[in-house]
């Protein structure tokens, strides 16, 4: 489990491609690798990956074919930086919201507005996922817990503060790029439950 508070952006220094998976080698800081062990879970752009090897602050992850297809890790190249968060430790402050590291879908960057007053990103997603995305609600964006701005039938707006831009890789994204999306699980459960109840009542009334 994760909090959506990105700890660092780290460079992908190599990608070894094999049948059915890619092995990512990510350069981390000594602070991030302190106490990290093989088998631990680390979020890379919001995707929960298992550590397979640690070598001189280089951390290795095996990324399965399905994960490559369903997330933007499939478009990641050597030299790119990914958002990194280690697993949640109970007893410490939680500043974001609980994320599982299981990406639901990808959003396409529709527009970027960077002015002296603001930095806004407009995202477009499949309309079925907009049932779970609400104005002022939370959503995981490349593993970063963010508040939703204006919403439409096909997407939503993000209003990013300088601190978020400094600590994450979101400033690197341009129109047409793909960003990993994890919706809030509690919101999904509530919406799905209400829809089932309403559908059942409608069926009984017919």
Label each PLM-derived region with a short phrase.
Residues 1-206:
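Conserved loop->alpha-helix
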């Amino acid at each position: 489990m994760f909090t959506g508070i990105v700890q660092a952006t780290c460079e992908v220094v190599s990608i070894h491609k094999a049948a059915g998976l890619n092995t990512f080698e990510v350069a981390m800081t000594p602070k991030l690798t302190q106490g990290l062990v093989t088998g631990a879970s680390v979020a890379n752009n919001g995707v929960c990956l298992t550590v397979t090897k640690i070598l001189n602050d280089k951390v290795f992850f095996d990324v399965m074919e399905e994960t490559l297809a369903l997330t933007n890790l499939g478009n990641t190249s050597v030299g790119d930086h990914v958002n990194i968060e280690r697993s949640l430790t109970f007893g410490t402050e939680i500043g974001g919201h609980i994320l599982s590291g299981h990406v639901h879908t990808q959003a396409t960057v529709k527009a970027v507005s960077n002015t002296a007053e603001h930095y806004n990103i407009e995202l477009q997603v499949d309309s079925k996922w907009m049932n779970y995305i609400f104005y002022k609600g939370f959503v995981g964006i490349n593993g970063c817990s963010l508040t939703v701005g204006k919403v439409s039938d096909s997407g939503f707006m993000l209003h990013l503060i300088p601190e978020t831009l400094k600590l994450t890789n979101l400033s690197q994204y341009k129109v047409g790029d793909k960003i990993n999306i994890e919706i809030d699980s509690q919101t999904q459960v509530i919406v799905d439950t209400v829809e089932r109840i309403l559908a059942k009542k409608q069926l009984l009334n017919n």
